[in-house]
């Protein structure tokens, strides 16, 4: 396709400033990987201003295991702020069997990882205090201080400069054309790369993507939250909100928490005691994490019902899990300063960055007042804005740019006709399917694949293998094939109830040969839920160890990224307070099959079901009674 004059001029300029001779970089073995080779290049800090100095850009190359690479994939991590080298294990797992003929390159974006680092203490060391009142906004002030510390380089960390760096690395490696995979913010950067360097890109995969000109109010996120609450309920026969409006039930819960916040002792994912204070803004924060922690969708309806019945434990646990992140840690693993520098340079703002801080704040306030009352349903405006979940006001005090504008998409740059695959989970709030459709429509040769029952980013932790397989085939053929599995991705099994004890629990269903009585059937239901609950916690537990809802511990073994089986060992795990479950559980992640041998009270049973279907769990075994023959247990439990 012939570029128009403005775009051609931009493309020529970009080619001049990023070109590097092949073989112009020295590669050395990486200290923590026997096969990877590490290197660095030096690039201009500001390509339009030679006096601005230089920056160091670090990268890794993983060769094709079969020797000769038929293709090279450049993988770009999300954030902003996370280094791509830190997620290399995820990208290698994604390539899987394709690694034999595929090389992988990961480049740490300027500002993070082993590249020229932004380690901005006001942000990096910011005390973790979510949901501060709007009037205080201490994080906004920390962002302003960080911008001031960066000085004349505060506008030197934009996405455009970062992807120019990546192309410079590929040129130095002698790879003139390559495939690109970007996840989350990495897909934003990948769009910028292909718009600035279309001739370098062989094919493009955008996973969990959003438009460069997204809505800065993030209203798409709330629309998806409402639809996801409805969809997860409709798809799970055990959802207690199936006959209600889930969005309205969430709104009712928010109003109740606003009137009387929940304060209770709970436990974090590792089982450590934590004090939870949950108000309406806190609930907004919990639900904002649901596309990354699907247990929130799984548990919320039943947890809300339990809270209404006077039991705060399930809801408090969701809050403890959602807010367990804590402080930022070292900047090389996540640079909060880079996050702010990118957002204040590239992201659409709710005010003009040419205005003064006072003027920016006035424009933001006016925009908020102009929104309809239900703009952030199921939350009202003050709840959602006050939850401080989006970067609405981060850039109020960010310095004005001192160099020529360098937006991610150069003026006049057209979306190229390059084979493009766009993946998005239908439960993804932060990079919604609404935005993904807009992105796909802009690329002339694109295929959009919605992935059912999946949250944020579909292919990196894809235990069923559907999205990952689509990506691998796409890189091999540059065509989206075998996509039907995306619509069949298994639904979540929502919790039916959180009874405090087995006395108020639902009963398991007797099958042929069962000799149980009602109390044993209720205990069996509790035992099955204890096993399912431990599996649901697996993605969030630290150090492979977690706690039961009402007591007990469990451990998990099995590499997170290899998609092999996970073995869980339960010791006194209590979903219901009076049913302590111990035993061994094997969960086959690729098939969803669960097999358990457990004991609780006088019962010894086996338990089997699949997370990939809605078929009930089958429980077989016996219960001993003092002085009496064993009672045969032959029961089923709705898919836990």
Regions found by a protein language model. Name each.
Residues 235-348:
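Alpha/beta-hydrolase-fold enzymes
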Residues 10, 23-24, 28-41, 103, ...:
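Solvent-exposed, charged interface segments at domain starts and junctions
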């Amino acid at each position: 396709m012939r570029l128009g004059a403005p775009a051609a001029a931009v493309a020529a300029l970009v080619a001049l400033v990023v070109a590097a001779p092949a073989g112009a970089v020295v590669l050395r073995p990486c200290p923590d990987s026997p096969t990877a080779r590490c290197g660095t290049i030096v690039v201009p800090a500001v390509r339009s201003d030679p006096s601005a100095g230089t920056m160091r850009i670090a990268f890794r190359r993983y060769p094709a295991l079969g020797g000769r690479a038929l293709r090279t994939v450049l993988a770009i991590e999300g954030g902003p702020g996370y280094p791509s080298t830190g997620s290399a294990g995820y990208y290698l797992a994604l390539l899987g069997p394709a690694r034999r003929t595929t090389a992988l390159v990961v480049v740490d974006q300027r500002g993070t990882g082993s590249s020229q680092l932004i380690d901005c203490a006001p942000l990096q060391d910011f005390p973790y205090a979510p949901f501060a009142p709007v009037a205080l906004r201490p994080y906004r002030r920390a962002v302003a201080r960080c911008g001031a510390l960066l000085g004349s380089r505060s506008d030197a960390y934009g996405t455009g400069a970062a992807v120019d760096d990546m192309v410079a690395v590929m040129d130095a490696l002698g790879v003139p054309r390559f495939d690109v995979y970007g996840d989350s913010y990495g897909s934003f950067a990948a769009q910028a790369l292909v718009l600035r360097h279309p001739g370098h890109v062989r094919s493009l995969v955008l996973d969990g993507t959003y438009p460069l000109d997204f809505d800065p109010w993030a209203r798409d996120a709330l629309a998806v939250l409402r639809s996801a609450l409805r969809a997860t309920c409709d798809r799970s026969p055990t959802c207690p909100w199936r006959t209600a409006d889930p969005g309205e039930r969430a709104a009712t819960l928010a109003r109740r928490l606003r009137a009387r916040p929940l304060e209770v002792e709970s436990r974090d994912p590792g089982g450590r005691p934590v004090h939870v204070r949950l108000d309406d803004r806190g609930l907004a924060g919990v639900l904002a994490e649901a596309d990354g922690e699907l247990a929130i969708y799984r548990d919320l309806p039943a947890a809300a019902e339990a809270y209404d019945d006077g039991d705060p434990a399930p809801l408090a646990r969701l809050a403890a899990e959602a807010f367990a992140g804590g402080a930022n840690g070292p900047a090389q693993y996540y640079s909060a300063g880079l996050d702010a520098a990118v957002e204040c340079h590239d992201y659409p703002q709710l005010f003009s960055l040419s205005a003064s801080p006072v003027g920016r704040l006035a424009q933001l306030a006016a925009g908020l007042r102009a929104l309809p009352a239900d703009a952030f349903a199921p939350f009202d405006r003050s709840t959602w804005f006050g939850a401080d979940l989006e970067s609405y006001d981060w850039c109020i005090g960010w310095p004005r740019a001192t160099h020529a504008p360098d937006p991610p998409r150069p003026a006049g740059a057209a979306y190229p006709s390059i084979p493009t695959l766009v993946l998005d989970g239908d439960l993804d709030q932060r990079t919604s399917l609404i935005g993904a459709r807009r992105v796909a429509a802009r690329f002339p040769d694109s295929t959009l694949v919605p992935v059912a029952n999946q949250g944020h980013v579909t292919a990196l932790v894809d235990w069923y293998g559907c999205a990952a397989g689509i990506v691998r085939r796409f890189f091999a053929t540059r065509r989206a094939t075998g996509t039907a599995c995306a619509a069949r991705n298994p639904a979540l099994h929502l919790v039916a109830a959180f009874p405090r004890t087995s006395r108020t629990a639902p009963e398991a269903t007797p099958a042929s040969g069962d000799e149980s009585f009602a109390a044993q059937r209720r205990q069996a239901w509790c035992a099955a839920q204890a096993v399912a609950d431990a599996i649901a916690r697996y993605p969030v537990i630290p150090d492979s160890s977690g706690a039961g809802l009402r007591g007990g511990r469990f451990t998990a073994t099995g590499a997170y990224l290899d998609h092999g089986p996970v073995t869980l060992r339960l010791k006194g795990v209590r979903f219901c307070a009076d049913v302590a479950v111990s035993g061994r559980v094997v969960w086959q992640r690729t098939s969803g099959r669960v097999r358990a041998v457990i004991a609780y009270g006088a019962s010894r049973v086996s338990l089997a079901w699949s997370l990939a279907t809605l078929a009930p769990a089958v429980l077989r075994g016996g219960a001993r009674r003092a002085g009496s023959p064993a009672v045969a247990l032959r029961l089923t439990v709705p898919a836990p």
